Regions:
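Intrinsically disordered, low-complexity N-proximal targeting/linker segments that flank membranes
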Residues: 1-68
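Generic structural signal of hydrophobic/aromatic residues within well-ordered alpha-helices
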Residues: 2-7, 11, 27-28, 58, ...
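Residues immediately within or flanking Cys/His clusters that coordinate Zn2+
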Residues: 81-84
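Hydrophobic, well-ordered secondary-structure elements that form the walls
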Residues: 87
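Short, glycine-/Ser/Thr-/acidic-enriched flexible segments
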Residues: 90-93
């Protein structure tokens, strides 16, 4: 099966409100498509796990990690549990969630930080992605709550029930600093380990 076929199979299911979210691959120029009384949604695939392989700022760190290790990282991240779907259509010619995650210097494509922004969105709290998340609020409203979103997309392993917090891949102090990426080999390997553990758990 293709990644697209797996996405269709995984996310065509009942929503928290009881409605069925049927996804189609038959709409021209649309990766995944849904249209019903609950709305029209054009969805695209996006990676959960980020290796930072293409970030020049940490090229010197990657050079310290063996090629075999880098290949293992990529092999895991390019499996089904390493991906999710977001709305893929532009609204008013503005950036999509996928693009905003990558362009925002306070997120740097990290999914743990993206998920924290989504959590804050559901609570109406300011965050670095609030503008783009508000733009696609109809999509997030399908899941009724942050808990509903986590459950629908099988993200529960990123949530710590004991302290009611995201399980971040790097230390997080609520400040959303710019360039939240590893600064040395040890930080990078810890980041990769935590991220990889989540991808593996999500696939079980």
């Amino acid at each position: 099966k293709t990644l697209r076929a797996f996405h269709k199979e995984l996310w065509s299911k009942q929503l928290p409100n009881g409605r069925y979210f049927e996804l189609s691959v038959n709409e021209a120029n649309v990766y995944l498509y849904h249209k019903s009384e609950i709305g029209e949604y054009k969805l695209a695939s996006d990676g959960i796990a980020h290796s930072f392989f293409y970030v020049k700022r940490i090229a010197h760190i990657l050079n310290q990690v063996g090629r075999d290790e880098l290949k293992k990282i990529l092999d895991l991240y390019y499996t089904i549990p390493g991906f999710i779907i977001f709305p893929g259509n532009q609204i008013n010619k503005k950036v999509t969630i996928n693009a905003a995650r990558g362009f925002n210097a306070r997120i740097c494509d990290r999914f743990d930080l993206t998920l924290e922004c989504i959590r804050r969105f559901y609570l109406g709290i300011e965050n670095p992605l609030i503008e783009v998340l508000n733009r696609y609020s109809a999509f997030f409203n399908l899941f009724q709550s942050f808990e509903g979103y986590l459950e629908f997309f099988l993200l529960q392993d990123m949530w710590d029930d004991k302290v009611s917090k995201i399980k971040f891949f790097m230390p997080f102090d609520n400040s959303f600093p710019t360039q939240p990426i590893p600064s040395n080999k040890e930080e990078y390997l810890r980041f990769i380990q935590k991220q990889s553990e989540f991808v593996q758990l999500r696939g079980q």
